[in-house]
Amino acid sequence: MIVVDYITPLMESMKISAYYTIRISIIVLTTVFIVNYIMSTGIMKKLSNMLSPILRRLKVNPLSISSTLACFFSPTVGYSILAEGLKENKVNEREVIGASLANSFPSVLSHTFTFFIPVVVPILGHTGVLYVLIRLGVALAKTIIGFLYLSIISEDYSFEMPEINKLNKKENAKKSFKSTIRFAKRLIPIMFFMMTLVLYLSKIGFFDYVEKFVQPITNLLNLNPNVGILALTEIMNVQAAIVMAGGFLNEGILSSKEVLIGLIIGNVLTFSTRYVKHSLPLHVSLFGAKLGTKIVMVNAAITLLLDIFIIAGLLLI
């Protein structure tokens, strides 16, 4: 009778995972603290002020421009400007939809500093950089589409930039530290668990077994079956998928291109639930059920289309 030893691979996986988690966590949490502190000093507001003279030259509703500039440091503030403008009849529904598209790049850019750079890049390395560039590229394309649409439908108004309050610098360090601790409580357990799981399942041959079930689908796209596992993991938890992707890269299970495809496929699979959970409540509360839903659907559809084009492009490389 053959006795399979499952304990030794588990202990080895936990040991490697603990070392990896400690090493990456130091980098990630230090970066998170620094980025949170810098963001609280109003750097994104300074960036919006720098871009203000350029954007003023666009012949679009000034509230649309104001909303886009505000989204560089607070997407919620940016959309609130549009909501107030709509109530006061200073902006119409079509302009709100166009502005919501135009707000994509500054909104994702702020997310880049709070999640992509401090978390994704340290875990995935150069693959993480490529993933960030892809997400920024999609957002930039949506912003360009939004401004093109606004330039067609908007009237030429006199520009008036709403006053936006700066954050209190005295509370920066304390606020950044608390934010980092909260983030650490979420990230470290997920990182340790997912890295241990990936290493352990790899050692006992689980991924070879799963390949038999996923292979028919992935074979159609000429992909490694583990790409499907990564995409399915992203449906459950984005951070878990990022950590799993890092494990796949470290173990040589997936290539850089396959990780990118897996993460983007996961993004496509989760786009509906993500928009419903995160975007829809905010937009409905600000713009009402009809317009709020329309804004979310337009943004989701364009994001989905662009992601599909990117997946197709990566498959052809």
Curated annotation (Swiss-Prot):
Membrane-protein topology: Multi-pass membrane protein
Q: Name one GO cellular component term.
A: plasma membrane
Instruction: Kindly list the places in or outside the cell where this protein is found, as annotated in its UniProt entry.
Output: Cell membrane
| Chief location bin | membrane
Asked if the keyword Transmembrane belongs to this entry, the reply reads yes
Disulphide-bridged cysteine pairs: none
What Pfam families does its record include?
Answer: Gate
Which keywords, in A-to-Z order, does the entry hold? Cell membrane, Membrane, Transmembrane, Transmembrane helix
Q: Transmembrane residues, as ranges? A: 24-44, 63-83, 136-156, 187-207, 229-249, 252-272, 295-315
Assigned protein family: To M.jannaschii MJ0880, MJ1556 and MJ1589.
Name of this chain's protein: Uncharacterized protein MJ0871
Q: Give the species this sequence originates from.
A: Methanocaldococcus jannaschii (strain ATCC 43067 / DSM 2661 / JAL-1 / JCM 10045 / NBRC 100440) (Methanococcus jannaschii)
Kindly list the organism's lineage. Archaea, Methanobacteriati, Methanobacteriota, Methanomada group, Methanococci
